[in-house]
């Protein structure tokens, strides 16, 4: 039987992998966005685990709101990424200082 601690450890591992992904690769915007999405997934895992073990559905309902915000964030981030690639022909974070405005 899986306990609450197992799910919390899983969430912590996912969150740590996302943090490592951001710190090890600061150049590629796509990988940074994927790491942020992995962080949100880890938080959602913890919400569902706490919600299940406390017998309350508020955590599970909140997960739907977080997923909605994550989907909007991914769509806006990818739209900015496509515009950046069309403008600069690169997706490196270091080249963002070439933009004017």
Swiss-Prot record:
Protein origin, superkingdom: Bacteria
Keyword list, A-Z: Cell inner membrane, Cell membrane, Membrane, NAD, Quinone, Translocase, Transmembrane, Transmembrane helix, Transport, Ubiquinone
InterPro entries xrefs: NADH_UbQ_OxRdtase_chain4L/K, NUOK/Mnh_C1-like
Biological role stated in the UniProt entry: NDH-1 shuttles electrons from NADH, via FMN and iron-sulfur (Fe-S) centers, to quinones in the respiratory chain. The immediate electron acceptor for the enzyme in this species is believed to be ubiquinone. Couples the redox reaction to proton translocation (for every two electrons transferred, four hydrogen ions are translocated across the cytoplasmic membrane), and thus conserves the redox energy in a proton gradient.
PANTHER family: NADH DEHYDROGENASE SUBUNIT 4L-RELATED, NADH-UBIQUINONE OXIDOREDUCTASE SUBUNIT ND4L
Subunit structure: NDH-1 is composed of 14 different subunits. Subunits NuoA, H, J, K, L, M, N constitute the membrane sector of the complex.
Keyword presence, Secreted: no
Locations listed in the record: Cell inner membrane
Protein name: NADH-quinone oxidoreductase subunit K
Transmembrane segments: 4-24, 29-49, 61-81
UniProt keyword Transmembrane present: yes
Gene responsible for this protein: nuoK
Membrane topology classification: Multi-pass membrane protein
Family under the similarity heading: Belongs to the complex I subunit 4L family.
The enzyme's E.C. designation: 7.1.1.-
Gene Ontology BP annotations: ATP synthesis coupled electron transport
Natural source organism: Burkholderia multivorans (strain ATCC 17616 / 249)
């Amino acid at each position: 039987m899986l306990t609450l601690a197992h799910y919390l450890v899983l969430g912590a591992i996912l969150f740590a992998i996302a943090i490592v992904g951001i710190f090890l690769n600061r150049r590629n915007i796509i990988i940074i966005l994927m790491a942020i999405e992995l962080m949100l997934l880890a938080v959602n895992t913890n919400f569902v685990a706490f919600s299940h073990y406390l017998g309350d559905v508020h955590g599970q309902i909140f997960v739907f709101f977080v997923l909605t915000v994550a989907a909007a964030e991914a769509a806006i981030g990818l739209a900015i990424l496509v515009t950046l690639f069309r403008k600069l022909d690169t997706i490196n974070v270091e080249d963002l200082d070439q933009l004017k405005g």
